[in-house]
């Protein structure tokens, strides 16, 4: 028995010493260098220069999600994710996406309970174009009756496809409704058909004017650019 105990103790000592040796040689992640700015229009800007590849990735975070929707207007944040691709003063329907694709880039968006995020990845020499397009749709989005009604039907169909017509599609909605009895997280991001049908163009315009403003947004740029030059471009647009 004593021999077994001695062997066990020795094994534990060896394991402990090995763990300490491993801990001392652990590779630590590189330091993340970035600059944080607040512009005069209260837009928050985060810049992280990375010259490893000749591309730039941009995300613009609007700090509005399903938790911020007015009562009886669930799905508005997600609806606006769609509306932001439907043209502005200087860009036609879906032109934002097609321009990014034409230079070899990608763009998309997603909506959560807390945020609506739009992202673009482009070759670095198209940074100026990308910033101009984001500024254009933030300031001059085309919010008209025809596009609103068309996109509302798209969102309703998306709900039918992803939730209503799936065997367990509404399970998460029931779980959230039980977990958050009063908190706005109980409202599904996709919204309800009834709320979407009840919405009006005036509701949509009010939502846009309230939340899609520089003071409610954070722009993140990471990639192959000169930090000072990128900062000047953002201030320009």
Predicted regions and their residues:
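N-terminal signal peptide c-region/cleavage motif recognized by signal peptidases
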Residues: 16-18
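Hydrophobic alpha-helical context, especially transmembrane and signal-peptide helices
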Residues: 12, 32-33, 56, 173, ...
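Acidic/histidine-enriched segments that form metal/cofactor-coordinating
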Residues: 88-89, 95-207, 236
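Bacterial N-terminal signal peptides that target proteins for export
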Residues: 1-11
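Extended hydrophobic/Leu-rich segments
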Residues: 9-14, 204
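His/Glu-rich zincin catalytic helix
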Residues: 21-97, 119-122, 128-135, 205-237
